């Protein structure tokens, strides 16, 4: 029975490794702050973004991720600030944290080059008791790991009116140590993540715009992964799109610009190699520019 318990716990820990890595959102291209801190202030007006994602519905302990963020450009200055609260839970692991963002933008001819950094703190909690093992009295399965850990990231974003190119590493720290019962143990840390992003906007006519985008992701010890996306906007109000993530998933996206200030989006994701592993994602954004007398680009495609 003990071997069965250990097998179950080991399997769940292996699955929970997904939470140790940077969360991947299907709608990342509409708020790249999670991927690139240089994106702070890119929209020129103050804006708040809310995002929640649920995976593998119906499975106890399935991944759940969410965040709320705010960023804005400082008036008459070339720098921007922002902040974010987030959580990322899966099986026995719980992560939550706070982040601050700072970016500096250098105007160029017909484009802008922005450099940004993020900094914050993350609470990591792994409760092995959540596994509900058959042999509940096993001390090895009653351990709780809890620690507060520093986070930092860096990014660059070069953008024009209809295009952007970005390079970033939202997590510069790789692994951590923690004290449990007076003993130093290795905690499951986050491997270094490196992103290259890019996109372009094609105006088909006055009512239709196409926006292809690409994201390359490199993680230490894992194959290079790319995310290819195509979105179409109709009348600056309705956006429909689809994404393909190599060897991982396909994503369908629907966006609605209710007015110049408020946008809502939904993404449905289906894993390619695993059945019954769908994910649902909801995004909402509100921009304060209209209230402050500033012009809002409706819609802003990135």
Task: Give the location of each predicted region.
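Initiator methionine at the very start of the polypeptide chain
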Residues: 1-2, 19
């Amino acid at each position: 029975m003990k071997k069965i318990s250990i097998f179950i716990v080991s399997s769940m820990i292996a699955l929970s490794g997904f939470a140790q890595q940077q969360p991947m959102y299907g709608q990342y291209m509409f708020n790249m702050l999670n991927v690139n801190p240089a994106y702070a202030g890119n929209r020129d007006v103050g804006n708040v973004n809310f995002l929640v994602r649920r995976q593998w519905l119906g499975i106890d302990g399935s991944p759940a991720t969410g965040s709320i963020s705010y960023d804005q450009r400082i008036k008459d200055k070339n720098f921007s600030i922002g902040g974010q609260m987030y959580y990322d839970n899966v099986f026995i692991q719980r992560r939550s944290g706070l982040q601050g963002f700072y970016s500096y933008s250098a105007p160029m001819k017909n484009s802008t080059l922005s450099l940004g950094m993020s900094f914050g703190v993350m609470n990591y909690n792994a409760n092995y008791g959540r596994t509900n093992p058959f042999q509940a009295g096993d001390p090895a399965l009653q351990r709780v790991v809890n620690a507060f850990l520093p986070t930092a990231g860096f990014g660059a974003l070069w953008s024009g009116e209809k295009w952007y190119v970005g390079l970033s590493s939202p997590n510069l720290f790789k692994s951590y140590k923690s004290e449990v019962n007076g003993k130093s143990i290795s905690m499951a840390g986050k491997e270094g993540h490196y992103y290259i992003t890019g996109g372009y906007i094609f105006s088909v006519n006055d009512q239709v715009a196409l926006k292809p985008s690409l994201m390359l992701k490199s993680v230490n010890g894992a194959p290079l992964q790319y995310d290819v996306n195509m979105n179409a906007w109709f009348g600056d109000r309705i956006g429909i799109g689809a994404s393909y993530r190599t060897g991982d998933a396909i994503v369908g996206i629907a966006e609605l610009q209710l007015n110049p200030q408020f946008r809502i989006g939904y993404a449905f994701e289906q894993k390619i190699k695993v059945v019954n592993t769908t994910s649902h994602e909801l995004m909402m954004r509100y921009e304060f520019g209209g209230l402050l007398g500033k012009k809002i680009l409706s819609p802003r495609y990135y």
